[in-house]
Amino acid sequence: MTWFIDRRLNGKNKSTVNRQRFLRRYKAQIKQSISEAINKRSVTDVDSGESVSIPTDDISEPMFHQGRGGLRHRVHPGNDHFIQNDRIERPQGGGGGGSGSGQGQASQDGEGQDEFVFQISKDEYLDLLFEDLALPNLKKNQHRQLNEYKTHRAGFTSNGVPANISVVRSLQNSLARRTAMTAGKRRELHALETELETISKSEPAQLLEEERLRREIAELRAKIERVPFIDTFDLRYKNYEKRPEPSSQAVMFCLMDVSGSMDQATKDMAKRFYILLYLFLSRTYKNVEVVYIRHHTQAKEVDEHEFFYSQETGGTIVSNALKLMDEVVKERYDPGQWNIYAAQASDGDNWADDSPLCHEILAKKLLPVVRYYSYIEITRRAHQTLWREYEHLQATFDNFAMQHIRDQEDIYPVFRELFQKQSANQSA
C-alpha cells in the first residue's frame, strides 16, 4: 500500500493564502463591519467569530467598458425588422438595476445583488479588533534582561549526562539501526529456511544439501545476533538551553465601581470595556498580569470570576480603591522592574469630600510610578466632582487619560482611543 503525506503548510485549508489576501485587500470595510457588530454582542460573546458583510460595490473588480451616453457607431447583422443603413433609436433613460442597498423607490424593472457576506474566524476577528493597539509607554527593563534566564527544552542531542538520557528516543534509534543492518540478512534467512523446508519434504532425501543449508542458516542467525541491541550511536539526550526572560513585564490594574449608583446597564458597559481590555492583553502580550479591584465603600482585590459576576454593592468611596492599588504596587510590583498600568471605570458618583483625596493619591503616589492611567466615566448625567478633579490631573500628567462613555456604541471607539498605538515621535 502506498501512503501519501500532505506536508503543505495550508493543510486542509488550501485557500488560506487567497483568504488572507482578501482580508488584507478589504481590511477597511471589514474593520468597519466589525466595529458595528461588536456593539450588538452580549458581554459573554465578545471573542467569537463574526459574519461580515461588505457592499457589493466595494468588492467589484475594475474593468473597461463603454460609458453611458455619447455617440457611437456599430454595425449589426440585419434581420426581418432592420435592413442596411437603418438607425436604432437611443433608449430613453439610463435603465439598469442596482445593488440592493435598501434605498430608493420600488420598481418593476431592474436587478442587482445583495451585500457579500462571509464568516471570519475567532483569530481573524481578534486580530482585526485589536490591530494598531498597544500599551502606551511600554519600556524594557534592561537589567532583568541581562541577569535572569529561564531553562527551556530544545530538542535532543547526541551528547549529554546520563541523567538527561531519553530512553524512548534512544530505543527508537536502536530499533531503526538494527532493522537497517539486518534487513538483508533476514530476507536471505527467510529464503534459506523456505528452501530447506522444501528439500526436507522431497524424495529422495538430499542430506548433503540439507546440511549445507543448515550451516548457512546458523551462520546468518549468528550474524544477526551479533548486531548489538544498543549502541552509543543510538543514544539521545534531552537538550536544554537558557533563554533570557522577556524584559518587558507589565501589570494592569482594573478598578471597577460597583456602588449602588451603578445600575445594571452601566455595570454591563463597564464589564464590556474590561472584557475588551482582557482580550487585548491576553491576545497581544504573553507576560501581562492583571489585578482586579472592585470597590464601593470598601475596596477588595478579587479574582476574575468575582470581578465580573459578584453581586456585592454599597456606597461610593473611590479613594479606597486607589489606596489598595498603591498597597499592592508597593508589596508586589517594583516600578523599576514592572510596567504598571491602570484602567478605572465609574459612573462619576463619589462622596464629594473624597474626590480631592483621589486627586492627591493619584498625583503623589500612583501617577509617578505608572506608565499609563486611564479613566472612563459611564454616565448620561452631568459630570460631578470626581471628573473635575481628574481634569486637573489630565492637564498636569501626560500619562493620564480620561474618556466619557454615554452609550454602548461608545465603548469600542473609546477603547481604541485610549490604547491607540503611538508613533515614534509621540512616544519620544
From Swiss-Prot:
Biased composition (Gly residues): 92-103
Chain intervals for the UniProt region annotation (Disordered): 78-111
Biased composition (Basic and acidic residues): 78-90
Pfam families (alphabetical): DUF444
Superkingdom of this protein's organism: Bacteria
Protein family according to the UniProt entry: Belongs to the UPF0229 family.
Name used for this protein in its record: UPF0229 protein YeaH
